[in-house]
Amino acid sequence: MPLLNVDQHGYLSTGLSPNASGGYAEQVLAQSSLIFEVPNGLDADSAAMTEPMAVALHAVRRSRVKTSEPAIVVGCGPVGLGVILMLKAAGVKTVVASDFSPNRRKLAEQCGADIVVDPKETSPFANWKEFGLLGNVSDAINMGMGLFDKLQATRLPWWHGWRMIDKLGALPKRPVIFECVGVPGVLQQIIEGAPLFSRIVGVGVCMQSDKIEPALAINKELEIQFVLGYTPLEFRDALHMIAEGKVNCSPLITGVVGLEGVTSAFEALRDPEQHAKILIDPKRSGSDIQLMKH
């Protein structure tokens, strides 16, 4: 794990502090207790994906998504693609992926997304009726009161019937929406489009101020939560999921470059049609990016 215990400073993230430097160096100081053995002869390229996959695993676990609940991933960069992989590994039956980039949508399909949409043409929330979701308060009131009327017509006390239906999971599904963009305005767009009772999970890191309309989220009874990082157990589990073939993260690796090419790699990553994730190999010479074909 990229953490270093630096005396009075405690644990610091490697490469993000002067006291725990070495993010892009030939050698880096590692915490011996946080070194994990790579299992099953896993290749170095795949093992290097453990950290971003641990982030995705943490997001999926914290979301409490059920296998029967539709999951919607907004943004198919490396974070979103990792979330798609972990959702499918968790057994989620329906994963919808949304991105403007044709290349990213193609990668989302390779990662296991069941439905891929271009938000310029189709909202990722357009098919909510097909998934048994509720789109507005009026639908919820009519559904609830219709159920209430039917239960009152039975011999059993209606509240017992309601509890039984709730226990059996027969009430409307609650979709889980993963915001993996991290750009101001996206969270508000999701709130506007999300079906009732959705759970929104903020995975993308927005570094700027943003605005949302709480009243709209209240009327839809939305849950909004944010996630960060991972635990040592999730880091270990992500590594073993990759090694055991439960997660195939190779579609994310679109290029490899040496240390001399780090600057050009960041420039290349600006174009979503070119790359998703570029691995840095300190042993590789030259600044050219080697394209990976899958």
Question: Model-derived features: where do they sit?
Answer:
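Short helix-loop-beta connector
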Residues: 42-43, 64-70, 172
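ADP-ribose/adenylate-binding Rossmann-like module
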Residues: 176-179, 192-210, 224-225
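Rossmann-fold dehydrogenase core element
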Residues: 199-201, 212-252
